[in-house]
């Protein structure tokens, strides 16, 4: 199975979808922002093949960025982005620097793997349990 690059998005919420037989299926609604390829790592130079993507507008003040990030966004001629992620890909699935990706990158009926970052509310849940028990 070939490795293709991923996309960066944010979770909007959950809903349900009904198939043709009337069965309810739970779905997660995602907002996929435009992703821009900011760097390419090759097997010859780095020992592995990957693409670095930037997405989600957020950092308005360029002075708050580190110097290498300022140079990267200046070279790409785009506004600074909030998220920078690297995706390992096969050597033949690389794209050019500056290429943009959106939802059209996905194929119809394609299964996708999703990873997320939790904001960690475990301590809050623990305190709720303690307060409710007392």
Predicted regions and their residues:
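Extended basic (Lys/Arg/His-rich) segments that typically form rRNA-contacting surfaces
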Residues: 1-134
């Amino acid at each position: 199975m070939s490795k293709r690059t991923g996309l960066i998005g944010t979770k909007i919420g959950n809903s349900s979808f009904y198939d043709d037989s009337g069965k309810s299926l739970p779905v997660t609604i995602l907002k996929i922002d435009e992703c821009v390829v900011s760097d390419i790592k090759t097997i010859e130079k780095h020992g592995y093949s990957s693409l670095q993507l930037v997405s989600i507008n957020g950092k308005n003040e360029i002075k708050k960025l580190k110097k290498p990030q300022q140079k990267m966004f200046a070279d790409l001629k785009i506004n600074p982005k909030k998220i920078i992620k690297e995706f390992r890909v096969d050597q033949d699935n690389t794209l050019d620097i500056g290429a943009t990706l959106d939802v059209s990158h996905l194929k119809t009926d394609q299964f996708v793997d999703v990873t997320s970052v939790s904001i960690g509310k475990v301590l809050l849940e623990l305190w709720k349990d303690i307060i409710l028990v007392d």
